[in-house]
């Protein structure tokens, strides 16, 4: 994919988690390294989702800045989260853990070393692709739509 990834401490005050942009045909992802490592992985995957899915919005050097990567009010942010969840988390790992005897939402997220809000995107994606499992939200709600 050819992406320059930069870990930065420059955005600690304003809460910026990460951003991506395309300048002179070079793709950039900047991640706030003051976040826990598991959050940095999520932000990296989320920004990769923007670079792949939202090229049009990034034309002309525009940046997609993320202060809340779990934002569900924006279609573009949801798409980037679903991309990241499917890219970073293997379906088989989720299925194996969900079928263990002491599986619950939070334990599985912890075992996968991912934040629980991010795990909700993975479960929702898997249910939409036909997997049957318990999910933490009512799928008839507007939470991820």
Regions found by a protein language model. Name each.
Residues 1-145:
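Active-site hotspot residues in diverse enzymes, especially metal/ion-binding acidic/histidine motifs
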